[in-house]
């Protein structure tokens, strides 16, 4: 006999002490907190290298907020997908539970539906949090109420369509983040180019001395660096999430 599958003890979010989402849905507060920790940890690792090229791109004054937002959104997306993967692994464990009688003469009917439902209750602690068992329990309950076996297939189909729509909607946040990441990069591009153009205009106005021109050109190149670096960061982050 297989061991009871306890959602309250096996769900990754429940283990941490947060309210777990149903099926493969995630707790966005928890995933956001984990993403914030990852972002802070990444900047902590890069801080000693802020004077090098790889560190400068993340600590540049003009693009620091955008770089942090890009990294946070990327981390949030990865944490959500990782949590969903762990939850999917838990859902797959329901396939190992034996709920169908081994008797070859068993026939599903309103009278025998109760025995299957009882096995489900012994297989897991709460069928509502397991997609497979929730779907079966819902169909069996309708079978006992309606008394028509022929309606079970239609009930399964309706419930499957509902579950599919629910799963698709659970990816809306990830889709929004994937969309927002490169947009942030392009916003950084616009800000960087605006800074560079403004500095270049200042250079033209003070073009009387070469030393002043050189000093002002540093601001121009800094703005251009911000423009291209944030675009690169946004595109690379979106690519990592898509992979």
Language model segments and positions:
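Helix-termination/interfacial motifs at the ends of transmembrane alpha-helices
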Residues: 51, 55, 167-243
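Large intracellular
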Residues: 2-167
């Amino acid at each position: 006999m297989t061991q009871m599958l306890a959602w309250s003890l096996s769900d990754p979010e429940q283990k941490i002490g947060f309210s777990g989402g149903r099926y493969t849905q995630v707790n966005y507060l928890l995933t956001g907190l984990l993403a914030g920790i990852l972002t802070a940890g990444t900047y902590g690792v890069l801080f000693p290298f802020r004077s090098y090229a790889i560190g400068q791109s993340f600590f540049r004054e003009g693009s620091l907020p955008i770089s942090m937002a890009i990294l946070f959104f990327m981390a949030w997306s990865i944490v959500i997908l990782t949590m969903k993967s762990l939850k999917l692994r838990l859902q797959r464990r329901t396939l190992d539970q034996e709920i169908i009688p081994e008797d070859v003469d068993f026939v599903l009917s309103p009278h025998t539906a109760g025995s299957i439902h009882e096995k489900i209750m012994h297989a897991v602690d709460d069928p509502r949090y397991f997609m497979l068992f929730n779907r079966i329990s819902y169909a069996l309950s309708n079978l006992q109420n309606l008394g028509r076996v022929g309606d079970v297939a239609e009930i399964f189909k309706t419930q499957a369509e509902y579950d599919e729509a629910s799963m698709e909607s659970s990816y809306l946040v990830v889709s929004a983040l994937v969309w927002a990441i490169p947009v942030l990069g392009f916003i950084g591009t616009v800000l960087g180019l605006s800074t560079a153009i403004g500095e270049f205009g200042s250079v033209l106005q003070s073009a009387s001395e070469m030393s002043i021109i050189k000093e002002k050109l540093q601001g121009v190149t800094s703005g251009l660096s911000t423009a291209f670096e944030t675009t690169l960061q946004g595109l690379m982050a979106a690519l990592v999430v898509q992979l």
